């Protein structure tokens, strides 16, 4: 997951690995506390989960990100879809 997120953020070095790993954990925790089952979140092949985490990280990574609100909305939409898909 770390490499997937780093690629989506256009990060090639390891300088930000700790921050990115923390964001990945925070995204998973937010999804879990929003009712998404941990077993669902651990499925590394689930594209909805991967893209939700990616959008969370894009919204939260760095400073002065003019697109952070756009990525936050995308994350919230995917979180809602995950809740529906999981329970459907």
Where are these regions (language model features)?
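Divalent metal-cofactor coordination and adjacent catalytic microenvironments
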Residues: 1-88
């Amino acid at each position: 997951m770390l490499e997937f997120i780093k690629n989506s953020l256009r990060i090639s070095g390891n300088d930000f690995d700790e921050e990115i790993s923390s964001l990945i954990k925070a995204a998973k925790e937010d999804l879990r506390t929003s009712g998404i089952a941990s077993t669902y979140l651990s499925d590394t092949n689930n594209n909805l989960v991967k893209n939700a985490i990616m959008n969370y990280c894009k919204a939260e990574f760095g400073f002065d990100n003019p697109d952070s609100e756009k990525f936050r909305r995308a994350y919230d939409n995917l979180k809602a879809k995950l809740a529906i898909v999981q329970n459907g």
